[in-house]
From Swiss-Prot:
Organism annotation: Invertebrate iridescent virus 6 (IIV-6)
Annotated Gene3D superfamilies: Glutaredoxin
Superkingdom, natural source: Viruses
Membership in a protein family: Belongs to the IIV-6 196R family.
Xref: InterPro entries: Thioredoxin-like_sf, Thioredoxin_CS, Thioredoxin_domain
Protein name as it appears in the record: Uncharacterized protein 196R
Amino acid sequence: MSFMLYLDKADFILSQPPPSNNQEKKKILKNRITNSFSLIMFSGNNCTYCQELKPIFKKLVGTIPNCQIGTVNVSLQPELAELSQQTTTPIRYVPLILFYINGTPFKEFGGNYTEDNLRQFVKEVSIKAYEIIGTPQQEEGSISQHSVGKAVSKRVCYLNFDNAYNGTPPPSFD
C-alpha cells in the first residue's frame, strides 16, 4: 500500500558537506528517507498554487517505482524553513518541489506543474540518479545549488519579501 508522507521538522537533519579545497560550504538539509528516492513538495497554507498542486501531487503516490512522495507544510513548520536558509536548499518560496536521493537533495523541479511534467521529471532525474549512485567519485556534498526567485512570476508565494527579487525566476504553473 502506498501513501503520501506528511513530513515535519523531525524528518529532516542538517549534514556537513565533505571537506574539499578548504572552501566554506553550506550545510545540507537532508530528509530521513534513506532507502529510496523521494519527491518532496514544500507548501504553505496561504498559497493558492500549493492548493491547486496538491491533488496533482497526490496522484503520483504509488505510481513511480522506488520513489516516495511527501509533503511539508512550512506554515506549520516555520522552523524548518528558517533552518533551511543556510543550506544548499533554502526554502524561500512555495510550492517548492525537490527530488532526493537517499535523503540528500539532488534536483529542484523547475517545470510546469502538471502531472505529466512531474512524472517526466522524476523519470529523467531517476536515470541520472542511478548513474550517480553507481559512480564512486560522486561526493555526497556535490549537489547542485538551488537558486530562487525573481519577482517575474505571480504564481508562487514568497516566504520572505526580501527574497522575492533575487536569483532566477521560479517555475511557472502554465
